[in-house]
Design a protein with these regions (language model features):
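Juxtamembrane/transmembrane-helix boundary motifs in multi-pass membrane proteins
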Residues: 1-2, 151
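Hydrophobic ligand-binding cavity/cleft-lining segments
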Residues: 3-7, 11-71, 203
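Solvent-exposed, polar/charged alpha-helical surfaces in well-ordered, non-transmembrane soluble domains
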Residues: 45, 49, 55, 164-167, ...
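A short acidic/glycine-rich loop-to-helix N-cap element
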Residues: 144-168
Length: 204
């Protein structure tokens, strides 16, 4: 009997320690923050469509089955709204993730506010830094907060797995972008007096 009481007491103590550890970790300074970056051998102008256009986004964002633009919002820029349809194989149903553009400075910065009622909200910033010689550093910095206390408590357990997905996505972005032949007209200006033909200004 005494042994059973001791085992039960030890189990409860371990559970309390675990919960306390999760609570402390979930209240750390960078709780819910997910950052990743990758260097891509392309100019920012060539990468920009890959983080803004539905056809390109579905090629590198994991689980993204479809992007549904809100036709009542601006076609692009601040205030543009769209919904990402996420098909997580671990989930029983697809998740609709609506987002609104909050910052639009092509081809350098884009900010998006995401909010799934009852689940989470996030602010994600994409930064494209021109490194010269046709190279760009792409950074994704997201800060997520969860609506329920339980989800917030379990954040330290969820974030590492979510981070692995973000890193995989960035790696896939690099592979997809660099697989496309480089645009020879990037960086060519019409006022170049030595050019025998005008530069194509229609390329994205």
């Amino acid at each position: 009997m005494k042994l059973a009481i001791r085992i039960g007491g030890a189990t409860i103590a371990l559970l309390l320690i675990g919960v306390a550890g999760l609570w402390i970790a979930s209240n750390r300074r960078d709780a819910g923050r997910m950052r990743a970056s990758v260097e891509i051998e392309r100019a920012p102008e060539e990468i920009w469509p890959w983080i803004t256009e539905p056809e390109e986004l579905t090629q590198w964002v994991g689980w993204l089955a479809e992007v549904k633009p809100d036709t009542t919002s601006p076609a692009e820029g601040i205030g543009h709204r769209e919904t990402w349809v996420m098909d997580d194989p671990r989930a029983r149903a697809k998740m609709m993730v609506p987002g609104t553009v909050t910052l639009w400075e092509p081809p350098d910065h884009m900010g998006v506010h995401v909010e799934v009622p009852g689940e989470f909200s996030a602010d994600v910033l994409y930064t494209l830094t021109d490194l010269g010689n046709g190279n760009t550093r792409v950074e994704q910095d997201g800060r997520y907060t969860y609506d329920s206390r339980l989800a917030s408590l379990l954040e330290p357990l969820r974030t590492p797995g979510n981070m692995r997905k973000v890193f995989d996505d960035m790696k896939r972005l690099k592979e997809k972008v660099e697989a496309v032949p480089e645009d020879p007209n990037q960086g060519v200006h019409d006022d170049d007096s030595t050019s025998t033909a005008p530069a194509d200004s229609t390329g994205r």
